[in-house]
Regions:
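Catalytic active-site module of serine/aspartate enzymes centered on a nucleophile-bearing elbow/loop
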Residues: 269-297
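Short amphipathic alpha-helix adjacent to the substrate-entry channel of hydrolases
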Residues: 77-97
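Gly/Ser-rich "nucleophile elbow"/oxyanion-hole loop immediately N-terminal to the catalytic nucleophile
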Residues: 122-136, 156
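Proline/glycine-enriched tight loop/beta-turn segments at coil->beta junctions
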Residues: 44-46, 53-62, 218-220
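Short beta-strand/loop motif that positions the catalytic acidic residue
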Residues: 225-227
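Alpha/beta-hydrolase active-site loop
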Residues: 105-125, 280
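Hydrolase active-site cap/lid region
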Residues: 151-205
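A glycine/proline-hinged amphipathic helix-loop "lid/cap" segment
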Residues: 1-53, 288-297
Length: 297
């Protein structure tokens, strides 16, 4: 195991330390068919994985899921169990990707990869998906990228997104939340938050596609926001849910007060992971059916 003192200086060690947590995630549903693909991207081919149930019919809706990892770690394998679970629960085509990571590739590289995969989904229609029914979800840094992707798609004429699932997102580069100092989540505190901002945002800390809490959120798709109590990003997610409601966005906010940051990946350790995935699948399916109603935090 890497020396924790080195984690802020060596992103490679961060990645090794994160892999030690993979034991907490159950293997996903092996009945789900998968296909690894390379998606053309502005920064080169993007590794992606397409998930589908064996009984999938053409015209199914789709979900793009964006992994977390503090913008410096993770890949398509990181959320494999959750992505399989979404495909099984919703009957949608689910796509995960390995976007470019900081510090080698700071903003906007990772967001551009997400944009390119979303556009590929809408234009190439893998597994015969319905391009008019695409949802996006993500956790932690991927939650940030989920909101940024919706903003850029709204403002740049990108593919229509029908629903957002936003798990314990990073939203505020000012790090003004005292949760960064008081959270009891091991190994994640203010120093780690400052490191993340430094290597990912660099000089773009005020860009609303990075500090998404400060963006104009009006007109975003219906959203489900999941927050947790033992988390330095607790307030980041709560404030985002409140800002979405204030912007008139149909928003469901569920707070898991007893859960730590990253709990979606801890399916071996807690039933809450599957419960939250059930909720995400349910709300996304309602959006696909056009029956989602306005709920607020």
């Amino acid at each position: 195991m890497p020396n924790p003192a080195s984690l802020l200086d060596q992103p490679h060690d961060v990645r090794l330390a994160r892999k030690a947590l993979w034991f907490a995630c159950k293997p996903g549903d092996r009945s789900i068919h998968t296909e690894d693909v390379k998606v053309p991207g502005r920064g080169g081919p993007i590794a992606a994985r397409v998930y589908r149930r064996p009984d999938l019919q053409p015209g199914a809706p789709a979900i793009l899921f964006i992994h977390g990892g503090g913008f410096v770690d993770g890949g398509v394998d990181f959320c494999d169990g959750a992505q399989r679970g979404l495909a099984a629960r919703t009957g949608a085509v689910v796509v995960g990707l390995s976007y470019r990571l900081a510090p080698e590739y700071p903003f906007p590289a990772g967001l551009e990869d997400c944009q390119d995969v979303l556009r590929w989904m809408a234009e190439s229609r893998p597994a015969g998906l319905d391009p008019s029914r695409i949802a996006v979800g993500g956790e932690s840094a991927g939650g940030n990228l989920t909101v940024a992707l919706a903003l850029s798609s709204r403002d740049g004429g990108g593919p229509r997104i029908v629903h957002l699932s936003i798990y314990y997102p990073f939203t505020d580069t000012t790090l003004k939340s005292t949760d960064w100092d008081t959270s009891d989540m091991p190994g994640v505190g203010r120093a780690e938050g400052e490191f993340m901002v430094r290597v990912y945002a660099r000089k773009d800390t005020d860009n609303p596609l990075v500090s998404v809490l400060h963006a104009d959120l009006r007109g975003l798709p219906p959203s489900t926001v999941i927050t947790c109590g033992h988390d330095p990003l607790r307030s980041d997610g709560i404030w985002l849910a409140e800002a979405l409601v204030a912007a008139g966005v149909s928003t469901l906010h569920t707070h898991y007060a007893d859960m730590p940051h990253g709990f979606l990946m801890f399916s071996r350790l807690t039933r809450r992971a599957d419960e939250s995935l059930d909720e995400m699948a349910r709300e996304t399916a309602r959006a696909f059916a056009g029956t989602i109603s306005i709920k607020s935090s």
